[in-house]
Amino acid sequence: MKRPGFKFVKTIYTPSSGTNPELKDAKWFFIKRDNLETYIGCILDKDDSNHTAKPIRIWNKDGTECTVTFESSPADAKLYLDTTRDNYDILTVQDTSIITNKTKAVAALPTPPTGTTYVANSRGTVRIKTVAYSIKYEVNLKVGSTNYPVSFTTINAEDLTAADSSSNPSDEKYNTAKRILDSLKTALDALSISGHTLTVTKLDSSLELSLKTTGSGTPYAAFELTTTDSQGGIHIDAFTEQVGTQAELPAQSVQGREAKVVALGGANETFWLEFFADDGTSGRGSWEESKDPTVSDGLNAATLPHELFNSASNTFVFRQPKKADGSTLAWKGRVIGDTITNSNPSFVGTTIQQAFYHNNRLGFLTEDNVSMSKSNDFFNFFYTSALTSTDDDPIDINCSSIRPAVLHGVLPTAQGLILFSRNQQFILFSDAEILTPSSAVIRGISNYEMDPTIDPVDVGTTINFVSKTPSYTRIFGMQTRGSEESPVVMDIGKIVSEWVPDTVNNLLSSPQNSLIALYGDNRSTYVGDKNIYMFKTYNVGDKIIMQAWFQWDLPGNIQFVSVDSDTMWSVVEGSGKYHLISASLTQTPEETIMTTADGQQINPHMDMYTAATNGLAGGSEKKVVYDSAGDFSKCYIPYADLTTRNPVILIAGNASQDFAGVTEFGFTVNPTRATDSDGTYFKVIGKDLSAQAANVYVGYQYNYDVELPKTYYRLSPEGAQYDYTANLTIARMKFAVGLSSVVGFKVKSKGYRGELAEFTGDGSTTAFSVPFPLKEENGIVVKLDGAKQASSTYSVTTTDAQATVTFNTAPTAASTAANVTTPAQKIEITTDTWYDVQTAQDLGQYLADDVPLTDSSVFTIPIHQRSDNFNIRVFSNSPFPVALTSMMWEGQYSPRFYRRT
């Protein structure tokens, strides 16, 4: 089938001066919110003066540039954009695109945390365990090298003096914790500690002490706290920071009191608790798990992936990820444990290579590690508790192998998460029903080399990836079979081995169309190609009924291509200008430009097709203008003329409505091109098309050109055996076509050469005229010293009688240097010996003034040659579709060898 034409949407970027392709090194991406919001964007070099203000540009599907703002607080978001195109990874989900800089090493926040007031052992707790008579309760503070002891002795139980607690509390006859604590607090408050201030808070059964430095500087000061009593310390105890078990902590304390529980298991079982008072100040409350106040609070958000947030239609903001309120940072820090019980994720200190979503988790690939966030908490990579592990805790797992494994690609499948490194592939899965830290397993599944700069893609149930050689590209297909089985891997590019060049650097897929495509984009180190290499399959159940490789030639240097549903979007560059174009991959277009009398809807098969206009607004807009003096129509184009392409115009309309408002529906012609003060236009001589201005479409021809392989006799109905040695004489070929218009057939026979002209280079002449036409469809051959030259090294202008070939660089003249004479370059210009074959068709009928299309036709091509003596091509460059459905042949088959019967 002839490829669809690309519709011109808009010129989205024009260079500041000249024809320099200023977006050539950009990282391009595609965002699909819904059918109304579709965007194409790119990340540029912020250090380039042309892009300093806008290092990210985004356009909607109409080609209108969107507003992109860059937050500068808490850090300048632009600083994150400091690398090249291959070092960005972009992951889009709904309204948020996660942008990862693969060269940015992730850092933790400072240790100790910035602004912390915590000083180890600057707080203490004195707890009365039991109240006894005639006991001396002692408390000693040691600040520096100085001891500050205080004590209180309880009354003797035999003292029978009458008590008068109302008038003289110190004469109280009963021992109470309150009396002991009051006395100790009074004594502690009376201490004079040079350069320090001691604060004592009395609770029901304990005293809380804190020591601060007087004046500026460190607010808190460390001290040693010890207690004893006259019976060996069984009635009173104290601690500053550490306890052996949680049971040693008092039921009452002050808000924010922190304590470290050092269990028998050592550092791996140590945890921190913080007291939260019921009234927010002191008294009763609860001890809750907290983090070590001396360790980092978490991750430095400025070094982590940033988000491109679609805040409104055509409006984006680039920033550190934030919560739904738009002000609170989304990255969560460490809230419990320390660097042992709640360590940093493995990507800290290294670079993140790719981000992904899987099983309701955000994941990162770093070196040979896979890190996944807490379940349903995408920006949290720290544990819930230092005491136990939960199923929703983060997953951090290593895929160590005997081969170097630096992960750079990931794709989810029903069997698990497929991980890709340069030399090996892995699967991350869980034998349990859900993926948890304890059930996650990584296992190697295959060992294929792949290009680390081209991400793998999935096409339905198949995964495709590429491997580069010094001269061409291999393409593999992988189908997983389960966590315990190796996948089935096929070299799907074997049939076109060495056809796909090594310059491709992008791979995309369209699962609903069973299609993959490869292309090389425009960049400083490589001028963008105009070709897309595509592979399409047709499956019925588990069987591949048909598969084919083919190539599309786009109207400009390809910068970006993406397929959304059944629409292919592309950005192409020409003379420094960037055009947004689109094509429908189905026969039913989204917009109807032409409808035949029997209701068939088609779009023009022209490149850069658009309604005639010069692209200006208001009274300056010109569409179709008739010049009565010269008797020609000017059909204006809204973009820079593609001088290497053949222009074409087409009259659109709707034949199913009795051609209402249309007088020449389906009329097409190849015009000439010209320019005036209103812009560039296509010139149609001898016709006044101004009355049809709304129906005039302008664009460029492109070729549908298929060279068929050799024909051999099939020995078995299944097509498993062919007779390659037999003498096969083809009498005629019959081609069945579907919905099609003009189609031609060309044959090249051995021993036949077209007209030839020879010249000799003189070092200055670049243009050489030949006395015969050179038609692209017949094949043009230009040789220098016998070597065929690429079409990009010369240009051709032709008429019906002659043609001129103009070289980009003049062929060299004869020269002599160091007694060595180099002859002048010999120039040969000829055709590729393809000639048109007139077909035979049955008589038919058509509706006058309708588009020249038929639902089905059969063309009979006379050949009368041996199958190895000719080649045949199917060719069309009309602005209408062509659908080749089948081919049959008639002829004489004669086996060459005797056979036993």
What residue spans do the PLM features occupy?
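Extended beta-strand solenoid/passenger and fiber regions
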Residues: 118-125, 593-667, 702-741, 748-793, ...
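Elongated alpha-helical scaffolds
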Residues: 85-106, 417-420, 427
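Long, charge-dense tracts
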Residues: 89, 96, 102, 122-129, ...
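N-terminal beta-propeller domains
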Residues: 1-61, 251-406, 470-486, 747-751
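Beta-sheet-dominated scaffold domains
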Residues: 399-667
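Short linear interaction motifs
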Residues: 21-24, 70-88, 329-353, 399-409, ...
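Beta-sandwich interaction modules
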Residues: 84-89, 401, 406-409, 685-690, ...
